[in-house]
A protein has these predicted regions:
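Membrane-integrated ABC transporters
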Residues: 1-43, 65-69, 88-92, 124-160, ...
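C-terminal portion of ABC ATPase nucleotide-binding domains
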Residues: 499-500, 556, 563, 573-621
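Primarily ABC-family ATPase nucleotide-binding module
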Residues: 247, 251, 352-403, 483, ...
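Extended non-transmembrane interhelical loops and adjacent amphipathic helices
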Residues: 1-16, 97-143, 224-272, 342-355, ...
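ABC-fold ATPase nucleotide-binding domain signature/coupling loops
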Residues: 434, 491-524, 533, 618-621
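Cytosolic ends of transmembrane helices, especially the final helix of ABC transmembrane type-1 domains
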Residues: 250, 296, 315-354
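Helix-to-loop junction immediately C-terminal to a conserved catalytic motif
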Residues: 423
Length: 621
């Protein structure tokens, strides 16, 4: 991959955008970091300055009142600054942990607000995975921008403080009686000396820039290795994985996979780079810092020896020069971190900036008391992004509110695609879908979605209370939740739970949570759809974990309680078909049969009759 050349302007622009993005997450963080950086950077200089005043007085007039004044000032000022620094340091660490967790809200909001068609793309999921990988394995991304800000302030304020305390070092004159050491007064010598120090530090900055470039190259090439390691290290935490691992001895497979993944081993790419180009450049950069400090020490000692200043000033300049060298080193290293982080911030914002291209209408869906809605598909066709095959082709049909509609067909026949189009998770490339005669794209998206309750086959429950799972909110009507659970067949299980609706699902947060079976989870998901009380209820194979008889019982019960709602059933198993008003049979993206259960059975050679006869033993006495 060809690397993009970036300027200092590019790096700073990305850093500033990251700060603007993180600041609303917790507005207290950056002010606290700024105050703490000020205290951290200037405390050494204040200590050095006050100590130097005491030494100057001790080596000079030794006046007790002056010594007491400086001693008391030193204790009070340094003590107060140290106390404040400790306070703000604790605040900074607490806020840093807080902002680390809260910044995930940015990604959650983006995930649920972007077009579903984009969210469903593999490249979008890979992009999000790459962002998480960068943060979890190398610490780069949004949070590193906060660290860079903190370190940059420490370095910059340290340099400013150091320059302020060492300016006298360069302005003080060596006496003319100092012989050859009077060269230290020469403007030419001072310019050459400054140029050498600047050159050494620019060289160190270039070294850190090269280290950042190498790290970015390693990071790009380590994507697969990162994912392998992440998969293996999180494997034990996945529910049910160790059962299969024990039975089928999968440990050896995982061990071999980990052994062959040399990304982070001593002999791998990172290990070789640490011992080679990165290690060498890091050592040279550290060495340059030591050389800078040594030159300043030598210059200071020669001036003091020549009589340019007293022992107190010598202490001040040596201490300030040491702190200044450390601050310069911090600033240069931070610039390297800034360079390294830019590419990862670009990845982050590429995800956060994904545009929503789905047309957003302005019409509201009628809140009809009679729930009199009708839906029509007109010559609808869809290809999924990146596919050349039609998932749905030239589909036309109508259905009225209050009807029972079954959609059947084999895997890949287009059943779920039909539902995704109905719910406007995708827009068709051809044709149109109408609600009460109006193209659904003209309705407000949230309003339109509000008329559907859906239970998908791959539904998810969250590790929260049972009541919150059903209601989708922490505030809910307990009686309605209980009724929905009872209607879904979960009533007996609910009665056995000591905490009732407050029972925590799963044990992610503690041992007081409960594990629910696949069948129980599906009943909770169905109860969630019932609680929403939308005019359309769609069941997309949600009963796959139930046996055929239990499924038939659930569907029969669901048919009773759905009332005047439109119910759409999708299932491999056909227990729902007997009481449906109409059945659509899909095959290879098209509707090949349409009619009632009895009418379709009369077509003995038809697809529906074949599917029904293969399963009839489960539904007939």
């Amino acid at each position: 991959m060809k690397q993009t050349k970036r300027t200092l302007k590019n790096h700073l622009a990305m850093e500033l955008r990251a700060i603007r993005t993180l600041h609303p997450v917790n507005p207290k963080f950056f002010p606290v970091v700024t105050v703490k950086a000020l205290l951290t950077a200037w405390l050494p200089y204040v200590t050095v300055y006050l100590s130097a005043r005491i030494l100057s007085e001790l080596s000079g007039q030794r006046r007790p009142e002056v010594l007491w004044k400086w001693a008391i000032a030193t204790v009070i000022v340094t003590g107060l600054m140290t106390l404040l620094r400790s306070f703000f340091k604790e605040r900074e660490e607490t806020l840093l942990d807080d902002i680390w967790g809260r910044k995930e809200i940015l990604f959650c909001k983006k995930a649920v607000s972007m077009d579903y068609a984009d969210a469903d793309k593999q490249e979008t999921q890979d992009l999000r995975a790459q962002i998480s990988q960068n943060e979890n394995w190398s610490g780069l991304g949004l949070m590193n921008a906060a660290i860079v800000y903190k370190d940059f302030l420490n370095g910059l304020l340290g340099v400013l403080g150091g320059v302020g305390l060492t300016v006298g070092l360069f302005l003080s004159k060596v006496p003319e009686t100092a012989g050859s050491l009077t060269i230290l007064n020469s403007p030419v010598f001072l310019l050459v000396f400054a140029a050498v120090l600047i050159g050494i530090n620019l060289w160190a900055g270039a070294l850190y820039g090269k280290i950042a470039e190498i790290n970015n190259t390693l990071s790009r090439n380590a994507t697969f290795g990162n994912r392998v390691s992440s998969y293996i290290f999180t494997f034990p935490n996945r529910k049910g994985t160790w059962l299969d691992a024990r039975i089928y001895h999968q440990q050896s497979i995982l061990s071999r996979l980990l052994k062959n993944n040399k990304t982070f081993t001593y002999d791998g790419a990172f290990g070789q780079a640490s011992r080679g180009p990165i290690g060498i450049r890091s050592a040279l950069a550290l060495g340059s810092s030591a050389i800078t400090t040594g030159f300043i020490y030598l210059f200071t000692c020669l001036k003091a020896w020549a009589g340019a200043f007293d022992v107190g000033s010598l202490t001040q300049y040596v201490g300030a020069a040491t702190a200044l060298a450390n601050a310069i080193f911090c600033l240069l290293k931070t610039y390297g971190d800034l360079q390294a982080n830019t590419e990862h911030l670009e990845t982050t914002f590429r995800y956060l900036d994904l545009p929503n291209t789905m047309y957003q209408g302005s019409l509201t869906t009628e809140k009809r008391a009679d729930r009199n809605y009708h839906v029509e598909f007109r010559n609808v066709s869809l290809k999924y992004p990146g596919s050349e095959t039609w998932a749905l082709k030239n589909v036309s049909m109508k259905f009225q509110i209050g009807k029972r509609l079954a959609i059947v067909g084999e895997n890949g026949s287009g059943k779920t695609t039909f539902i995704k189009l109905l719910c406007r998770l995708y827009d068709p490339q051809e044709g149109e879908i109408l609600l009460n005669g109006i193209d659904i794209r003209k309705y407000r998206y949230d309003d339109y979605m509000g008329i559907f309750s859906i239970v998908f086959q791959d539904f998810q429950l969250i590790s929260q209370s049972l009541g919150s799972n059903v209601a989708g909110s922490i505030d809910y009507d307990p009686q309605r939740v209980k009724q929905a659970l009872a209607d879904a067949g979960f009533g007996p299980r609910l009665e056995s739970l000591p905490k009732g609706l407050n029972t925590q699902l799963y044990k992610d947060y503690g041992e007081d949570g409960i594990e629910v079976s696949g069948g129980e989870a599906q009943k909770i998901a169905i109860a969630r759809a019932l609680y929403k009380d939308a005019p359309f209820i769609i069941l997309d194979e949600p009963t796959a974990a139930l046996d055929p008889m239990a499924e038939a019982e659930i569907y029969a019960k669901f048919n009773e309680i759905s009332g005047d709602k439109t119910a759409i059933y999708i299932s491999h198993r056909l227990s729902s078909c007997k009481f449906c008003d109409e059945i659509l049979v899909f095959d290879r993206g098209s509707i090949i049969q349409q009619g009632t259960h009895e009418a379709l059975l009369e077509q003995a050679s038809g697809k529906y009759a074949q599917l029904w006869n293969a399963q009839a033993q489960y539904y007939t006495n």
